[in-house]
Amino acid sequence: FIYFFLLLIFGSINNINFNKKELNKIKKINIIGLNDNDKKIILQNLQSIKFNNIFLIDYKDLNEILNSNEFIESHEIFKKYPSTLDIKIKKTKLLAKINRDGKLLFIGSNGKFLKNEKSNFQLPFIFGNPEVKDFLKLKSIIDESNILYEDVKNFYFFPSKRWDLELT
């Protein structure tokens, strides 16, 4: 009986101290595969999960935050115990430029529109109003053919879903 009484007393005191400790809290998030500016954007978006328990991470919310960024093609999440989260990100490749509603946008290999990024390399321009999936289908056909994608100067899309290519 005395052992049970001592267990209750010391267990209660230790539980009070145990609750004050920040065990298993995420203290550091490492992002691999992006430049510093893109890392800052992702880290700002991830602030809500930074101090959560590493064992209780809601992957649905984490994936939703990461997938909402148009420049991310894919990502992998690794837990480094006791308090670090590593996120390996593959950045999307810019495939073409398109004018949508008077704005110059880029189409990424992830099928999303990206806002005007400062790019120093030449990309083909798409004239017309295609669906992104139609363009990605054409891109895969070009990749399987003898035509080099780098040789394409412009794409012309017609309402009949016909594509014309202008080569350099």
Identify what each model region corresponds to:
Residues 85-159:
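Extracytoplasmic segments of membrane-associated envelope/inner-membrane machinery
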Residues 164-168:
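Short, intrinsically disordered, charge-balanced linker/junction segments flanking boundaries
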